[in-house]
Amino acid sequence: ESASREIAVAGSVSTYGSWRKYGVERLRPGFDQQIRILVEAGVDLIILETLASEPEIVESALESTFEIDIPVWLSVSCAKNKISGNLMHGVEESIEHDSGSLHFELFSKIISDISKKHSGPILVMHSDLKVTNGAVKELKSNHDGIIGAYPNAGFWEKPSWKFVDQITPESYLKEAEGWVSNGAQIVGGCCGVGPELIESLSQLNNR
C-alpha cells in the first residue's frame, strides 16, 4: 500500500533440511500447509525455493501447487562437478573455498524433467556466482518458459554467517548483464545480497 508503483508480493515456500528421517511422503502435508497459509494471506505468487533438495522433493513441492490459481515460480540450486566439469543439480557454497558439495543429477536433466510438469518460471538460486551464467544457459536450453537467477553474493563462514569475498554492486550488475544476455528475465539475489546489490540491478532497465 505504501509503494509508489505496482508491486507483487511473493510467498516463499521452503524445503526441509532433514527429510531423510521421515521420507518424501511425510513432507507433502508440510508443503500443502505452507502454500495454503500464503495463498490465504493474499500473496500474488508462490515461489518454491527447493535449493538442492533431491528431485523427489522438488516434485512433491511442485505437485502441492497444482490446485492453486496464482502464478508459481520454481527455484533450484546448481553446483559444478569438479571431476567431470558438468553442472549438477546440487549445492556448493563456494567453488574457491573448501565448503563441501552435494550433487544429485545433471542440472540439465532436472530442468528438462521439471519442464514437463511446470510451464512457469524456473530460476537458479543459492549458487556460486561462477556457475550461475552456465546454469542460465542450461535453463534456456531446457525450458521454454521464463527463466531467472538469484545467486549468492559470496562465501559465508559458519556458524556466524559472516560473509567474505563479497562482490561489489558494480561487479554484481556486470554479472547480471551476462545472465540477461543469456535469456534471464528475472534477476535478484540470495544469501549475502543486500539492498546495495539489488539497487544496482535497477540499472538493467536502462540498458
Segments the model singles out, each with a brief description of its role:
Residues 1-207:
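Domain-level signal for soluble alpha/beta catalytic cores
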